[in-house]
Amino acid sequence: MSVLHNDWAPIVEEEYEKTYYLKLKQFLMEEYRTKTVYPDEGDIFNALQLTPFGKVKAVILGQDPYHGPGQAHGLSFSVKPGVKTPPSLKNIFKELNGDLGYDIPEHGYLNQWAQEGVLMLNTVLTVRRGEPNSHKGAGWEQFTDQIIKRLNERETAMVFILWGKNAQEKEALITNPQHHIIKSPHPSPFSAHRGFFGSHPFSKTNDFLRGVGIEEINWNIEKSSDL
């Protein structure tokens, strides 16, 4: 698994010697050796690599990575360029268009958001091909809970965007009154019409950031995938 080269490194290194993480590491070594697992090993920590701790303005929590070939690359909801945009992400883009009027991109590659300070974090960071939730309970939840707890402790305010029940279970970890929580149903086609559409998470995030003197996020994504 890749080593981080930013201010997440000392935070993450505290986890490396814990019993749960050593077991997780052994489990993953065997899984990657004997099964097809996503994302590529070098992409597991992309969310942390692309959005340093001190630069986080907002957190979008996902569940586990996409389990189809070529989709997952370490950012929640995002897919690699050239891969068909999944249904939940299509709905995210529809809401972005309705909220801020931005054109819907032809791709689902969200690196630009990550570079804008949006931590695109799944609560489980790996998955077997074709088997959603196959790495649930292997130890990732403890790891990502620690990430959320450390963000919660940070003095500079941020927004936690919690879509759906699984993400909203993490609300208990967010106790710092400096931070702001935005909740709605999940953007999945099964629930988007129950309150995700029309929830305006992008403008609400920027309204909060502006109110506390933090530069707004540019949510506009380049339309073409020639990145």
From Swiss-Prot:
SUPFAM superfamilies in alphabetical order: Uracil-DNA glycosylase-like
PROSITE patterns: U_DNA_GLYCOSYLASE (PS00130)
SMART domains found in the cross-reference section: UDG, UreE_C
Catalytic activity: Hydrolyzes single-stranded DNA or mismatched double-stranded DNA and polynucleotides, releasing free uracil
One of the record's GO cellular component terms: cytoplasm
Subcellular location field: Cytoplasm
Enzyme superclass (EC): hydrolase
Domain of life: Bacteria
Active site: D64 (proton acceptor)
Pfam families with a match to the protein in the record: UDG
Entry keyword set: Cytoplasm, DNA damage, DNA repair, Hydrolase
Gene3D superfamilies, per the entry: Uracil-DNA glycosylase-like domain
UniProt EC number: 3.2.2.27
GO molecular function terms noted in the UniProt entry: uracil DNA N-glycosylase activity
GO terms under biological process: base-excision repair, AP site formation via deaminated base removal
Stated family: Belongs to the uracil-DNA glycosylase (UDG) superfamily. UNG family.
NCBIfam families to which the protein is assigned, alphabetical: PRK05254.1-1, PRK05254.1-2, PRK05254.1-4, PRK05254.1-5, ung
Function: Excises uracil residues from the DNA which can arise as a result of misincorporation of dUMP residues by DNA polymerase or due to deamination of cytosine.
HAMAP family tied to this protein: UDG
PANTHER family: URACIL-DNA GLYCOSYLASE
Record protein name field: Uracil-DNA glycosylase
Organism (species): Alkaliphilus metalliredigens (strain QYMF)
